[in-house]
UniProtKB/Swiss-Prot annotation:
GO terms for cellular component: cytoplasm; membrane. This is Bifunctional protein GlmU. Residues 1-225 are annotated as: Pyrophosphorylase. It catalyses: alpha-D-glucosamine 1-phosphate + acetyl-CoA = N-acetyl-alpha-D-glucosamine 1-phosphate + CoA + H(+); N-acetyl-alpha-D-glucosamine 1-phosphate + UTP + H(+) = UDP-N-acetyl-alpha-D-glucosamine + diphosphate. It comes from Paraburkholderia phymatum (strain DSM 17167 / CIP 108236 / LMG 21445 / STM815). Its cofactor is Mg(2+). Homotrimer. Pathway: Nucleotide-sugar biosynthesis; UDP-N-acetyl-alpha-D-glucosamine biosynthesis; N-acetyl-alpha-D-glucosamine 1-phosphate from alpha-D-glucosamine 6-phosphate (route II): step 2/2; Nucleotide-sugar biosynthesis; UDP-N-acetyl-alpha-D-glucosamine biosynthesis; UDP-N-acetyl-alpha-D-glucosamine from N-acetyl-alpha-D-glucosamine 1-phosphate: step 1/1; Bacterial outer membrane biogenesis; LPS lipid A biosynthesis. It is found in: Cytoplasm. The gene is glmU. GO terms for molecular function: glucosamine-1-phosphate N-acetyltransferase activity; magnesium ion binding; UDP-N-acetylglucosamine diphosphorylase activity.
Amino acid sequence: MNIVILAAGTGKRMRSALPKVLHPLAGRPLLAHVIDTARTLNPTRLVVVVGHGADQVRTAVAASDVQFALQEQQLGTGHAVQQALPLLDPSAPTLVLYGDVPLTKASTLKRLTDAAGHDGYGVLTVTLDDPTGYGRIVRDAQGKVERIVEQKDATAEQQKIAEINTGIVVMPTKRLDGWLSSLKNENAQGEFYLTDVVELAIEAGIEVVTAQPDEEWETLGVNSKQQLAELERIHQRNVADDLLVAGVTIADPARIDVRGTLECGRDVSIDVNCVFEGKVTLGDNVSIGPNCVIRNATIGAGTRIDAYTHIEGAQVGAQAVLGPYARLRPGATLSDETHIGNFVEVKNAVLGHGSKANHLSYIGDSDVGARVNIGAGTITCNYDGANKFRTIIEDDVFVGSDTQLVAPVRVGRGVTIAAGTTVWKDVEEGLLVLNEKTQIGKTGYVRPTKKKS
């Protein structure tokens, strides 16, 4: 089967310089969702018709199995499909999809193609309470499809018809060249409508069959930012429902966003307003507090993530505790039973089993052993303005509060670092290290007071 995806439109109502089909839904371009669905049908040819912003669209969805046809002037859907003809296999049927209709299920498309067969003509239709703005399916007295009439060309009687054309059709490719060449643009838009091919098919003795989707939202398109937002919420609720069915506890299914893939073990719980991006894997019994953002990360079983924690490109072991207000940046690798507390940032660093940094610290470009305690206000000074260096902290080290470790530096096993120490030289294992300072107490000091106005 050939699949042609129409993606050449300007999308004026989006009021954006970005081509309409590249606006994101769940973190990915609208067109990418359509291509993914098309791939599940195993097409022999997959062609995207581009026009407005053609170079941007090509770059965004380029792949070895995707070919592109250029529609230099947007002269209608029939003209768009005509541009793809040289790339199609004439011996296979052609399914036409739209780059701004991202939620159609593969099962719905399969139902349509099965109904049409190899040489038939199939139209995906839907019945709406308010069909205003859509092309109507006109049937004869026996219920057979006669033609499709666009809203602007429909009579008052035809505008009462509730069954509408979604635009998604499957057609015998070997007949398309003749049909498309016969189209006329004698309509209110002055365009070559793909819908007019229906009458040509009927004239050729081909019965036009129809199929309908399971859900009305499968055929909704995007023409404005409002419609994009509506489809985003539909998609996210569908994702949330799938997670609930799989056994995930979600505090409010209307307040979760998955912009990629989220894999969950058993008894995972997710509080409100959490965002998951890229590929995220949550082990059994993971608990996530409200307002967390997790991107491209793996979280081990039994780990608790408290509110407002941000995690990106990190690996977290089992039974860890993160947050609230913790930040794991790319390259952070935490072993089992580690604790990263409030206002602690970890970047490109490894923390061993049971190590803790509970308050107000920065751990960057570091290798931290097991059972290390990092006191509040500890900073690994990893950057000299031009280069970054690593800090090595071996097992069982106690780092006092307000410590600065100036990399490159190594702290040996079992070292105790006193509060307020700056460590700029390697420390042998087992030592107490401190910077000697004299504490002075002065008498006679008068604290300034505010003047009353």
